[in-house]
Amino acid sequence: MTPAGSLLVARDLHKSYGSTPALDGASFSVHPGEIVAVLGPSGSGKSTLLHCLAGIITPDSGTVSYAGRELSAMSDAERSALRRSDFGFVFQFGQLVPELTCVENVALPLRLSGTRRKDAERTALRWMERLEVDDLGAKRPGEVSGGQGQRVAIARALVSSPKVIFADEPTGALDSLNGERVMQLLGEAARSANVAVVLVTHEARVAAYSDRDVTVRDGRARDLEHTA
């Protein structure tokens, strides 16, 4: 797929840790509302690619552009603001704040941006309802199952109306049934809101929920047409 009309584009990324190359000429693009699975074995460079795309780490060479602007041309403060306003994140273990209730966790991005608590929690509950966890609002993360916690994390990622969600092995800690339901809900919610998803996984069953696959091997990315 060509970068024309893409929201996020990476070109010829190289990144090494010491003498060990993690990315060796990787290129990537994702369109608005598209779900792209990044597949590859452990150590292939797929998580490094995701972190470069999100502006968390800076590649040694190559460019990452979001909405036509290169991330490297932004200041650290601008990249941080971009991650708060336009990017959402879901990780393998959710990374919810244990001291907060589930609804407070989901509302947190809005609260940090200055939204009043009542309004933030009202919006949070709407997303929790879409992710089928609105009945868990008063519970804390330690009181819910792994699958429920991941749904809460997805609601938190979507609550601030991001343009891109970066999901790094979001079902890796779940059993098959819970993993499939989490992916169904993530896909439905993202597509309904026209949110792009960059999904890092090593599981073909998880990648089956994507529109397109990108395989990373030895630090190089190769686009594949999705044939589900």
Q: Language model features by range: what are they?
A:
Residues 6-216:
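ABC family nucleotide-binding domain
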Residues 1-14, 222-228:
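ABC-family P-loop ATPase nucleotide-binding domain
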